[in-house]
Regions:
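Solvent-exposed, non-transmembrane amphipathic alpha-helical segments
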Residues: 79, 83, 87-90, 94-97, ...
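Acidic/polar low-complexity segments with low predicted structural confidence
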Residues: 1-128
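Sequence-level detector for tyrosine residue identity
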Residues: 5, 9, 33, 49, ...
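Residue-level preference for alpha-helix termini and adjacent loops
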Residues: 32, 108, 117, 140, ...
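Von Willebrand factor
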Residues: 107-108, 123-206
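A broadly structural signal marking compact, well-ordered functional cores
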Residues: 71, 77-88, 137-141, 145-147, ...
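Generic detector of short, locally flexible boundary/turn motifs and exposed helical patches
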Residues: 94-101, 131-136, 196-199
Length: 206
């Protein structure tokens, strides 16, 4: 696995603990392999490393050729996310059977079954949250690797601009393993988004 996907960022004991926790039931024959990728942590610079480096260069070239379109998409998505966050924090008013009486509805008493004569102010959800972005890294994406990398980058950049903590992970199946390649983690700085261009699609989709 290390020769194909680089070293795991977990120690051997941590890998055992993670697999014992999550690989149960119908997944008991599955083995999780968590890595930052062969370009980030290679054992040796073998053919798999060179293939991954070549795809990274293709992904970056695609970004360079479509830079303005990608930047525009990032901006549009980021603004949508920011607006959604503002709305999410706003209070809203709903009809209710208790709260502040609305005189204009008093005529309904005895005439209709509608007993919602009041308005009640409710606080919107203000809890914090994080987002996980999963990217299909299986061979089914082999014909559009640069596009997938760009799409992942657009989403990650927009989330970063909106100030939303997020993690981006690629997944595929290889030799009985489910490989989870971490491109960025929740608290990583924005420049870490560039690692999404290390995306390479091969192996299977579990």
């Amino acid at each position: 696995m290390e020769l194909n996907y680089g070293k795991s960022y977990l120690s051997e004991s941590e890998q055992v603990r993670v697999n014992r926790k999550f690989c149960t039931g119908i997944h008991k024959n599955c083995i999780l392999y968590l890595t930052d990728g062969i370009l980030q942590n290679p054992v040796i610079k073998n053919n798999q490393y060179r293939f991954s480096q070549l795809q990274f260069e293709k992904n970056k070239a695609y970004y360079g050729n479509n830079h303005w379109i990608i930047k525009r998409n990032i901006s549009v998505l980021a603004e949508s996310l920011k607006r959604a966050l503002i709305i999410r924090k706003d209070d809203f008013v709903s009809r209710s059977d208790a709260g502040q009486l609305v005189p204009e509805r008093l005529w309904k008493i005895g005439r209709t079954d509608d007993d919602k004569l009041f308005n009640r102010k409710k606080r919107s959800e203000d809890s914090e949250f994080v987002i996980d972005v999963l990217i299909d890294s299986s061979g089914s994406q082999a014909g559009r690797q640069a596009q997938v990398a760009a799409q992942g980058y657009i989403i990650s950049e927009a989330l970063s601009q909106a100030g939303i903590p997020h993690r981006v992970t690629g997944y595929c199946a290889f030799w009985g393993y489910t490989v989870l390649q971490r491109f960025r983690d929740y608290e990583d700085p924005r420049e870490t988004n560039e690692r999404i261009f290390q995306f390479r699609a091969y192996a299977n989709n579990r």
